[in-house]
Curated annotation (Swiss-Prot):
Residues 1-48, 92 are extracellular. Belongs to the popeye family. This is Popeye domain-containing protein 1. InterPro entries: cNMP-bd_dom_sf, POPDC1-3, POPDC1-3_dom.
Amino acid sequence: MNYTESSPLAESTAIGFTPELGSITPVPSNETTCENWREIHHLVFHVANVFFAIGLVLPTTLHLHMILLRGMLTIGCTLYIVWATLYRCALDIMIWNSVFLGINVLHLSYLLYKKRPVKIEKELKGIYQRLFEPLRVPPDLFKRLTGQFCMIQTLKKGQAYAAEDKTSVDDRLSILLKGKMKVSYRGHFLHNIYPCAFIDSPEFRSTQMHKGEKFQVTIIADDNCRFLCWSRERLTYFLESEPFLYEVFRYLIGKDITNKLYSLNDPTLNDKTIKKLDHQLSLCTQLSMLEMRNSIVSTSDSEDGLHQFLRGTSSVSSLYVPSPHQRASAKMKPIEEGVEDDDEVFEPETPNTFKVRQLP
């Protein structure tokens, strides 16, 4: 009788598995491994994912975008922890979401701390609302500016803030908070300084690149005055680290100089009129006032420039031509101001900027 004896290897091949893997059930290649899907998770799981989705689709243009995003992620992580603990009993899911929750809570707390209302001293609130707030300086940045390297000082009526040819211009920059100051040159009255105005802005601008200069005018308190005073050197270093605030100061000082020059043209201006002087003057008027200021600051020892100015101009729009005999002082650099526009305060300077140059 003829018969063929089958080998164990052939039998193993016929049934589709090897002897070592005899316990594994073969899976056809045309079927998925997920034959039985699990049931839908609890509602808490889906609500958590809804909060995640809301946080991710929040537009970045919202003012509180980051706070809302962190808030949504915090709620989502909390619901995930509840779901993993009560309905899934998954320790690893609970631990990971606890870590994520802690990170989001810390970041959310930091964002809320930054958004806290900053309290500005009552005495400084006036200059903030008048000068800095319209230029969108944040309250916290203003508080940093006024909380360091500056102090509030007092002058009684008749006391001098600066004396011509005696007081150095390198020490400080000040804004008048209360009272009124009178500016004179060799006994001749020039103009008044009112609250929320810089006291020594022309000297600050004209001597930025020079050291050891002296005031060319005398500034005396006409009332009991209080003023905010910065150390000039430390203020300069601070503004170098804050480019935005540097541009703000550059604009404010330039505009303050313009107002002072306008006061030179019309000494009868009072505080209320100065407050209304927010519109830009014509080019002709600004050039006229800059020439007049240079005639005072950069005059020689003779008083020709002062007397010529005191004789005045018939119109604020008439251009003042300095005397050909006038010489620039070696001590004070003439003020050269470009014509600025409120809408282009923070625009880069163009090569076509108008400047006033002293005639030889």
